[in-house]
């Protein structure tokens, strides 16, 4: 050791006190300084040591050898201890120490010697380091002898090897503890997380001890080693090595050299500091720690942290139990433990690195603190918007951080290891705090403290807005009092009104009382709730600043009178409604929170009240009697007492704007009646204001609202209003109104806005589409909706939405874009563009038989919507409900109607309920119960390749666009590393379909973690907040079963009432029928004479004969069924006699011709039927009636679901054309499509949407048709049976063999027939294969079908079903069709066109000279093939009127004859072929009778009357060449007879029609020249009558 340079510290210069670089990087030693606390590095020139030894007498003549000295390492440590162990001088500072008295931590002033503390710490850290070397170590024992000053530290685990060092030739324990610069931590290539680094450690303790003993046992060598050093390690005793059995352990016992630290022994402060360090070990080393033989109760880091928070509470005087979130812990990595607590306004930290107590923090503390402060800064910015920006250091002052970390090869500022300098990148691990950790932090008081600090910081800003006693204010909205701001200002009154409209009333009153003492200022909406607002928010609130300026208020000033203010009184003038009460409350809240002393000044705050109802007699301008009411309960009580009096008129004053200027002047002339002073605020009333407006009092508000009882109102007859009465009797009405608007009823599951919409729709019987914006206007006018129509439009849209996650049963039918699951309804179109109507299903839910039993609300004396509906099933469970009110919120998921109906039936049968789980229509994912009242909704994800996954369902109410945004964020990798490469979007408005590509590495990780978890494809929904209004008050239900039981009880009562009501009504009808029968019979028998008598006499006679009077005149109409009943006009002077006479109008109003014996017989039959009906109802129980309604409901539910599924299948099976412009290909014609269709189980009747079948099969199908002549053939479908009435009219195949008629094109550019409404030239329609079959109208139909299929009820064109037809009527004499007539053929028209086509001249343009027709997909028609496949009928019916078989039609060619992309083969001509025999040739029917007279017909030349575009009138149509009119008689002169022509027609159409056509491609495009307009809403056409 003597050969070593005492200043050579090259082995440890990476971690020297001058080293600020990571390990293994060398740095030149800087120039040393006198008394420096930093160790020295390599020194080449000893001249650098100048100044090491101080000279007190520099004038002495000393030689150079004495001046320059070289010390040994040991001598240098003793000479300059501050370089190694810190200062040896006593230091006083505030530190955390252990208090034996309070048995906890204590933050106090401590006087200690840092060097002494450090040598003890080195031994403790060595013991803790052994835990990293041997994981089996589990105990540390520390013994402190206060009397002798001796300290010992014992630990088990692997001991020090008792072996001879091969190089140093000494035992290893002696080498480690008795020789400097020895360590096992010099290999920086090893990633060690121990505290030892420099090779000093325990040797420093030995050096500064008078006695130092090491004792260790090696179980492998079975030896025990003990050795003692004395006199500052200068004397070493002989090692004692003995044989021993037992476990390994190491024990260090030392007695510090207190003299070198200026101490005589251990004092109280040092003992407290040593004990705190022992407790540090217990909390951080993860081993059992004993102090003086007793086990320390601290088991983990969290318990250790709680010692500090208890001390903080104790210092505050809070001796209560710790809060739930007082200490928040997080351990995102095995090497990190992080704790958070709220500080008292200064940043505090307690941290450990490898069990070393880091008193000055360092990079590890900054690493954690920066993350927390960054998250807190985000929240501060959100909650303190537009306020003063806080710096991170200001936020840091409010947090207390605990860190226990294991850092690889840590570097410190000095050997004292008070501050870590290792860079974050070299920690060897990461500690990214979890999101849940942040959420828990935000729930503590830290945010409140930070915001409070921000508010204090903003005080200066608020003082800038303080008002002063100025005589003039610059604000155009303010009408200032003339004396405001003067010495008489305290007599002035500032009137605050609710909006500009109310300002007019105040201004009119101001004119009465004079402008000198009254000022007026209108408020804009509701005042800010300053109870939980920041100062920045208040400072930016213009209304509050205006009030401060106008009154002259100064921030935080205490007022005892108003003499220093511009206004001495503040008058609130608002509407007498709930919102007006809320505005008053907000103003009171502002004054109490900001200027509480003002509310203790008498007469400062007053309110101006106006009547809410006025009643009078006589002329409203000059009434004989008049009375005003200031509350509705007060008016209702008066009405109950005086309702029988006649002549009273009433008027509701819903707002201050209802009052006229004359009314205002009357009010202000009687100020004593209309002014109500608020009583001075009492101390206990402050809590009431906080209860009403503080967010922290939400739970207390729930109880307050539940205690509300209907009929509560504030009595305005008192002179002064207390704040207690205002809160409990007036403001609570606003809270209740808010809850009623937001929380649904348990009976019908509706909120008032939804109820108003349904009431309006039921009242209007809204069966036709109406714009949403228009319906909102009707609802607002019908039901007195008092809020904006925008929210009402959203309510209507919500009732009609059907996408996954919305309604299970929608009451309104959507017609237009009402939103989808892409954005959760946010993608809904504007209310101006969408339509809705009542869904027919709605009356299955809200039965009309219940309407007379319901209680209706009233507004302004008029009946409006019901208080509550009583649906057949609990809609609150079927459609769910969500809402947030005052103090209450509600969240009820959707349930399956099938399950609900089954359980209702089980309740009727007395059986237990089956458990139900949430269910959403259309959701294909999995729903599982994950605990009591908790359900997990999982999406669907599956692995489709080595690097690919497919997502086909998302958790409920996770919208497609939101999930797509998340995928984009993952790809951007701004927050977290990306684990996906790309994705493909195949989503539709109803289906979810993502295909995601991943790297192989990430794919394996995702599979190991779970694909569902990796992509967050699950969401939990709870049923713990089932809040709803029961029939009496707001209630929180414990379970869904409780809601079912509550609904069951209410609904069953209504079924009993419904039965009684129906029996009562039936009995009335029976009595009327009986009286009518007896009345008519008596007249017939001559027992009653009604002629030549006065009405009064006749009424008296009827009463004498016991005819029952029915006073309702409306019932007289029912008495005569559909016959009109004569009602005599009322005479206001006739009085009770007239009322009595009207009661017999059901008899006297019967028509004279009904006074017959036949009528008597009919009435008797009706009486029998009615009696039978009554008996049937009597036998039914209320449960039976309910079960019948439930069956109707569930059958309709299933039918609607089946219909919706069928419509979706048909739309999905519709083909897609090839588009040369958009580069899309056709779909649906291949084997794969047929296979897919078969797999879906599609109805084979959906043929009109499928690709055409082969010609062979088509021909075979047609040959099965039965004979019977042309007319019999025309009356039936060729291959389908006649649909039954149960099918709802025509079947899908009713469209077979029908086409649009086409007129001759004799004249250039002539229109065959104009459509009933203009067509858009930009719209094309592709005629489908079903249209090919629509050639001949069906005989069975009473009227022909329109050219465009009518719309279904949901606004979409019907695809498969034709509208029901009425009975055929006689057809008048044919006349030329007008443009407004339908475009279809009946039997006679068909023959007329046949004859016209036969009369056309032959036109055979060269096919080679034709231009190639372009095709594009521009169709949205209902079927796949257009009528362009057929061309004119005469094109297929060759030979009619022609002897040579050539074509005689100049109509456009068959679509199949045109050249098509990818096919140059046209339709083979059949003109020269002879007619084949047909089974219809033997028919003897004379079809010539069907042909009109032989008057020659020329080609029609129709001049266009407007811009309507027809099928054949396009400028690009090169086939439509002008043709001269045919010569007269040409059709008759040509070869065949009319009958033969008809037979030829039949042959072509029935037997050989499909043979004539080549097999068309799966999807035929529409030729651009032949453009047709698709009318989505065709105008109804007049049906043509058949003769």
From Swiss-Prot:
Ligand binding (ATP): 126, 155, 183-185, 196-203, 415-417
Domain Topo IIA-type catalytic, residue spans: 743-1190
Region of interest called Disordered, as start-end residue ranges on this chain: 1-47, 461-485, 1204-1587
Residue positions binding Mg(2+) 2: 575, 577
Active site (UniProt): 833 (o-(5'-phospho-dna)-tyrosine intermediate)
InterPro entries in alphabetical order: DNA_Topoisomerase_II (IPR050634), HATPase_C_sf (IPR036890), Ribosomal_Su5_D2-typ_SF (IPR020568), Ribsml_uS5_D2-typ_fold_subgr (IPR014721), Topo_IIA (IPR001241), Topo_IIA-like_dom_sf (IPR013760), Topo_IIA_A/C_ab (IPR013758), Topo_IIA_A_a_sf (IPR013757)
Low complexity bias locations: 1271-1280, 1524-1542
Biased amino acid composition, Polar residues: 1441-1451, 1466-1475
GO biological process: DNA topological change; resolution of meiotic recombination intermediates; sister chromatid segregation
UniProt-listed Enzyme Commission number(s): 5.6.2.2
Acidic residues composition-biased segments: 1-15, 1321-1334, 1379-1391, 1419-1430, 1512-1521
Enzyme class at the top of the EC tree: isomerase
Residues reported in the UniProt entry to bind Mg(2+) 1: 498, 575
Segments of skewed composition (Basic residues): 22-31, 1365-1375, 1571-1587
Annotated spans, Interaction with DNA: 381-383, 381-386, 1016-1025
Further comment: Eukaryotic topoisomerase I and II can relax both negative and positive supercoils, whereas prokaryotic enzymes relax only negative supercoils.
Function, in words: Control of topological states of DNA by transient breakage and subsequent rejoining of DNA strands. Topoisomerase II makes double-strand breaks.
Protein name stated in the entry: DNA topoisomerase 2
Source organism of the structure: Penicillium chrysogenum (Penicillium notatum)
Designated gene of the protein: TOP2
